[in-house]
Amino acid sequence: MNISVIIPVYNVERYVERCLLSIINQTYTESVECIVVNDCTPDNSMKIVEKLVADYKGSIQFKLLCHKHNRGLAAVRNTGINNAGGKYIVHVDSDDYCEPDMLEKMYIKALETDADIVLADMWRTYPDHEEYCSRQIVSLDKIERLRGCLVGRYGAIIDKMIKRSLYVNN
């Protein structure tokens, strides 16, 4: 498995279909798993997810996981990481969506550079406008970069592909 995409689900029935379809419609799907973690959502989010996954006929492997009680976003991310088999991990929040070639471009860059972390540009969408965000990162050791990514120092979580070994070994 090359890429594990982790999607948290809690009270996102308005957004989760677009999010999941943006993963399903990626140009690179051959060695991708999508781990959806239900954090005891009170709405119909998981019914939407389950229908999309049941109807899906492609090569992405899906894992649907469920917490026994609501534990919060950090616990959801940890559950996803602990169940991930990919060399790289991408976190996609349920209200986010990806450009169709995002995984392909990021994975190619990771292979070309043997990167621990790949950052991508992204769009931020607001009610009245959209804003293009270009990513630049200073040279730091890989642990400091990982910490910065996880606390939002380098933008949103969706624009990063992080080597799984950074999580597991640190």
Can you name each region flagged by the protein language model?
Residues 1-170:
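Nucleotide-sugar donor-binding/catalytic module of glycosyltransferases
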